[in-house]
Amino acid sequence: GFFGGSHDVLVARRHWRDDAVDTTGLAGSATLSVTEHRVWTQWAVNAMHAQYLQNKHVKYVAVFQNWLRPAGASFDHLHKQVVGVDSLGASLQAEIARVNANGNIYRDFVDWAYRAGLVVAANDGAVALAGVGHRYPSLEVYSTGPVCEPWLMEPEQVDAVSDLVHALHQATGTQVPLNEEWHYRAPGVAKEMPWRVVLKWRVSTLAGFEGATKIYLKTIDPRSLRERVVRELEQLSASQAGALAPGIRLGDECGQPYLQYGRA
């Protein structure tokens, strides 16, 4: 850890895939097995919980994964960062204010995404969809369980989120720079906020227009992103037995999701 123990870096074992023959064969989240990705996710959950237990000044623990240098990675090796900070950021405070005004805001958004045809995949504990309103093309995974804090969830609930995140990484591949960001309810926040993971594809360059207008141009819209990812997952499921975790439903098979946060 760095900075007095409030910055942990989790480093994966492999740098190259076992079958790599050139420098394009980097080992990333997409090349992990289902079981390995579950362990990788639980390791990060344990690390974030440990920071809250070990440092009373930590108000929020940020968990993120920068994949490849264009996405901010210091080195092209699979790693997660777990960083404890002593205050809630402005963005999180604004989100909490919106939640205080409407406790159903996350359900409302997921319901809207379903009606808009943006659901990518689902299982019995989570739902994945094409995100809206991000600076980059993005995919989101929401836990549909009743518990908000990842470290308080049953292992199978964490696995449900992990399995969909893993599937989205596989659909993305290892050649696309991306940021994986975790969002959840911080300790001390009264209103329920479900755990969600956002994958942002860093495939566009922000320039003067975006800075001047705060209008962010993207090369792929949410519906096209959804169609592309569903197609990749369907092909993967058909061609590689066991590549996706059991119980994952794709595209129109998913049905309408329901977030149970606040129902514990």
Regions found by a protein language model. Name each.
Residues 1-264:
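HIT superfamily nucleotide-processing domains
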